[in-house]
Design a protein with these regions (language model features):
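Pyridoxal 5′-phosphate
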Residues: 1-387
Length: 387
């Protein structure tokens, strides 16, 4: 099915049909767990019934896997054979942390105020004699190329960052960082869950990427993608082994451990069929609309919502960000206000947002609209906040 952004925005019937959550909710929580689209839910249901009544033909299943790899590879400028269909995001990040051949004294650069899944795999490397080097930006989440470059040394082996900070919404200039790291022969790992489906990504600037589908991709929990630069396969040993990623003819264990030559080497066992079918349907939507158009829409919505919230006296964390750093995340605070009460008021009115806290335990409210949200919904939010 083909999707048209203008039709989604201007035809309420189409919008309600394809994005059922819009029927009775104002959903502004896509940086958390996004609602499934009609297409994704239908794909999951169809697959469930198929394996209930008929058991899907193996050939059909592999055809769907290949189509999913193709869609995902187009989204990140990779090849289909370089896409592993695994989730959640933390699994891919841990594959990197555990698969690199570390030496005592090696350094990994990371941001300790990132989402925990992109912190613990790196800080835990102390057990292997690796030194985690913590980035300390002047403002939370604002990781700049200059900050990253200043943290490097002759012992830096990997830089592990998020393409977009989960709390502040600051979008990383990963391309500039990636170019400089390649010049120095330093590996670059990107947690892209807050960008996949919202922002164009090009893996030529990075070495590893991991992202689940349940946020901006509008897919199910636990279905995601993992990318590793194939040029690194010989020096990057998959740390998890099973019947799927190691050559096992006829499912018979072999004496020699020989990994597949494609990204299948990172898929250790039975595939998440239900999740992958849902993710495939969501990828079809993103592909049809075009991620560049989605990004433009999100920046427009960001500016609109930010302006409306500022008019009520809310402090918006992204108010000084350049446009290149804007995302679909608009996080606010208001000193002296009970944000728990504000969150409850919004929730009771059918507005879905996220209540979060910064490193100093100060409460924040995070809004994260997607392309199908309307400015009129923002006006309703403002009316609720005024009331």
């Amino acid at each position: 099915m083909s999707y048209c952004l203008s039709e989604i925005l201007n035809n309420q019937g189409v919008r309600h049909r394809e994005f059922p959550v819009t029927r009775d909710k104002i959903f502004l929580g896509h940086a958390g767990v996004a609602p499934l689209t009609r297409a994704a839910a239908q794909a999951v249901q169809d697959y469930a019934w198929e394996i209930t009544e008929n058991f899907q033909e193996v050939g059909d299943f592999f055809s769907n896997l290949q189509r999913t790899r193709q869609l995902a590879s187009d989204l990140i400028q990779a090849k289909p054979e370089d896409i592993a269909l695994i989730g959640p995001t933390a699994l891919g990040l841990n594959l990197v942390a555990l698969g690199i051949d570390w030496s005592v004294g090696d350094e990994v650069v990371y941001y300790p105020q990132d989402y925990p899944s992109n912190v613990y795999p790196w800080s835990d490397l102390r057990r292997k004699g690796v030194r985690p080097v913590a980035l300390k930006p002047e403002n939370p989440g604002q990781i700049t190329p200059e900050l990253v470059m200043a943290s490097l040394s002759s012992k830096t082996k990997l830089v592990a960052l998020s393409s977009c900070h989960y709390l502040t919404g600051y979008r990383l200039d990963y391309q500039t960082i990636g170019v400089e790291l390649k010049k120095r022969g330093i590996l670059f790992c990107l947690d892209s869950i807050q960008s996949l489906g919202a922002t164009p990504i090009d893996v030529q600037f990075i070495d590893f990427l991991s992202a689940d589908s349940h946020k901006w991709l509008l897919g199910p929990l636990g279905a995601g993608i993992f990318y590793a630069n194939p040029a690194l396969y010989d020096q990057f040993h998959p740390p998890l082994l099973g019947s799927w990623n190691v050559h096992s003819p006829g499912f018979v264990a072999q004496e020699e451990i020989r990994f597949h030559s494609t990204a299948q080497r990172f898929e250790i066992g039975s595939m998440n069929g239900l999740g992958i079918m849902g993710m495939k349907a969501s990828l079809e939507i993103i592909s049809s609309l075009g991620v560049e158009a989605i990004q433009s829409r999100l920046i427009f919505l960001h500016r609109s919502l930010r302006s409306k919230l500022q008019s009520l006296g809310w402090e918006v964390l992204s108010e000084s960000y350049p446009e290149s750093a804007l995302s679909g995340i608009v996080t606010v605070r208001k000193w002296g206000s009970d944000l728990n009460e504000v969150y409850k008021k919004l929730t009771d009115a059918g507005v879905v947002v996220s209540l979060r806290w910064d490193a100093n335990k100060n409460p924040l409210i995070r809004f994260s609209p997607h392309f199908y949200n309307l400015e009129s919904e923002f006006d309703q939010v403002i009316s609720i906040l005024k009331g």
